[in-house]
């Protein structure tokens, strides 16, 4: 069985992004033409820290999942926990 591959993070002014490449045997578990919730992508084996959202489907290559989260998410999340 192939392994799930994670890209490095990349950024714009609002979000940090990463893409996740699924091996064929995992990709076939994806529902067609819809965004997955966090519980769904975790259930198929994608492992990431909190805050990531599956936000788009790359139609030419549906086995590549596109994720984003707001810049500074982790710092803001940790500050809320500390309160």
From Swiss-Prot:
MF term (GO), any: cyclin-dependent protein serine/threonine kinase regulator activity
Organism superkingdom: Eukaryota
SUPFAM superfamilies cross-referenced by the UniProt entry: Cell cycle regulatory proteins (SSF55637)
InterPro entries for this protein: Cyclin-dep_kinase_reg-sub (IPR000789), Cyclin-dep_kinase_reg-sub_sf (IPR036858)
Any GO BP: cell division
Secretion signal, residue range per the UniProt entry: none
Family label: Belongs to the CKS family.
Record note on quaternary structure: Interacts with CDKA-1, CYCD2-1 and AT4G14310.
Known role: Binds to the catalytic subunit of the cyclin dependent kinases and is essential for their biological function.
Record-given protein name: Cyclin-dependent kinases regulatory subunit 2
Gene: CKS2
């Amino acid at each position: 069985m192939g392994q799930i591959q994670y890209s490095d993070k990349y950024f714009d002014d609002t979000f940090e992004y990463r893409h996740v490449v699924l091996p064929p045997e995992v990709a076939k578990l994806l529902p067609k033409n819809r965004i997955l919730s966090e519980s769904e992508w975790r259930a198929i084996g994608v492992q990431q820290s909190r805050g990531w959202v599956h936000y788009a489907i790359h139609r030419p290559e549906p086995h590549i999942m596109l994720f984003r989260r707001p810049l500074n998410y982790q710092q803001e999340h940790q500050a809320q926990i500390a309160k």
